[in-house]
Amino acid sequence: MSLFGTTSGFGTSGTSMFGSATTDNHNPMKDIEVTSSPDDSIGCLSFSPPTLPGNFLIAGSWANDVRCWEVQDSGQTIPKAQQMHTGPVLDVCWSDDGSKVFTASCDKTAKMWDLSSNQAIQIAQHDAPVKTIHWIKAPNYSCVMTGSWDKTLKFWDTRSSNPMMVLQLPERCYCADVIYPMAVVATAERGLIVYQLENQPSEFRRIESPLKHQHRCVAIFKDKQNKPTGFALGSIEGRVAIHYINPPNPAKDNFTFKCHRSNGTNTSAPQDIYAVNGIAFHPVHGTLATVGSDGRFSFWDKDARTKLKTSEQLDQPISACCFNHNGNIFAYASSYDWSKGHEFYNPQKKNYIFLRNAAEELKPRNKK
């Protein structure tokens, strides 16, 4: 029996292969277009864990839906299943065994989607939209962590309707990341908190934000021993901070860099500055991708402090991105991110998810 049982997809399968996709201004990088993309802005993407054979991609959208595709080695995408919330879906994640998907929504709930039965049940409740959701697999417990605009961080045993633990946040949760045994939560008013997850979740440290503007996205990175050691934090001001938790030399090791800005440099040609909508670290090389409201993605080597690549400009913002478990596929979503308000929203504009074979482009530069 397949992972999805006998569930049917929600569209026709695509036929394009890696390297043979057509191009125009919506796809200047000639990347593979995922078939049957959502009908409204795409807020989150997540690939299946290495425990599952093959690659499955999940996307959540402002059309209140969560969709799943199988991504074949050829690059062909096959729609597999779909679930609904009653509000926009703001975040998605997988269980470590790949059997469940967890979804967070503006409807103030989080759900657990069992892929084999294609059934989704509510597992969490907040007093405001749920902005982030992460699965935590510890030696002595497993739970789902939800962060909300109600200024709480809640931890849920999926078998109970009451949270295992509730931690108060200084402000609304804007973004978060988890790599056991570390969690990072960034809030409104530039709040930044690191949690340790061993034994049970607890606050480890509050950090003064290295960025002067609103937090937009955060991603934890690992050291050469595969342990979480710091994070990258992106803001609406076209800037990313690289921050180590316990660096030997904080003043030297922690730094920020500008990105997702136009080429203007002076008063005669002012620079346009765009939000960093997403950050993802390559699972093998430790290099990173950023995507922005300027409609570009960029690849970076944080250790060499160099840019590896910047894409051509798409005709709308890139709202989310992720790598598959071995780093061979880079997925990014092209859709309106609401950075210019409702008056710039065009409901006729199609939303896209693209897949790029980026294994070579993310390799670190050879040290001279």
From Swiss-Prot:
Location(s) in or outside the cell: Cytoplasm; Nucleus; Cytoplasm, Cytoskeleton, Spindle pole; Nucleus envelope
PTM sites of type Phosphothreonine: 229
Record-linked InterPro entries: G-protein_beta_WD-40_rep (IPR020472), WD40/YVTN_repeat-like_dom_sf (IPR015943), WD40_repeat_CS (IPR019775), WD40_repeat_dom_sf (IPR036322), WD40_rpt (IPR001680)
Pfam name, any one: WD40
UniProt keyword Isomerase, yes or no: no
Gene3D superfamilies: YVTN repeat-like/Quinoprotein amine dehydrogenase (2.130.10.10)
Protein keywords: Cell cycle, Cell division, Cytoplasm, Cytoskeleton, Host-virus interaction, Mitosis, Nucleus, Phosphoprotein, Repeat, Transport, WD repeat
SMART domains: WD40
Molecular function GO labels: microtubule binding; RNA binding; ubiquitin binding
Region span, Disordered: 15-34
UniProt WD repeat ranges: 37-79, 84-114, 125-157, 168-206, 215-255, 271-301, 310-346
CC annotations in GO: cytoplasm; fibrillar center; mitotic spindle pole; nuclear envelope; nuclear pore; nucleoplasm; nucleus
Any one biological process term the GO annotation gives: nucleocytoplasmic transport
Transmembrane found in the keyword field: no
Primary role: Acts as a mRNA export factor involved in nucleocytoplasmic transport. Plays a role in mitotic bipolar spindle formation. May function in attaching cytoplasmic mRNPs to the cytoskeleton both directly or indirectly.
PANTHER family attached to this UniProt entry: MRNA EXPORT FACTOR AND BUB3
Assembly information from the UniProt record: Interacts with NUMA1 (via N-terminal end of the coiled-coil domain); this interaction promotes spindle formation in mitosis. Interacts with NUP98. Interacts with MYCBP2. Interacts with USP11. (Microbial infection) Interacts with SARS coronavirus-2/SARS-CoV-2 ORF6 protein; the interaction displaces RAE1 from the nuclear envelope and impairs its role in nucleocytoplasmic transport.
Family named by the database record: Belongs to the WD repeat rae1 family.
Protein name as annotated: mRNA export factor RAE1
Native species: Homo sapiens (Human)
High-level lineage: Eukaryota, Metazoa, Chordata, Craniata, Vertebrata
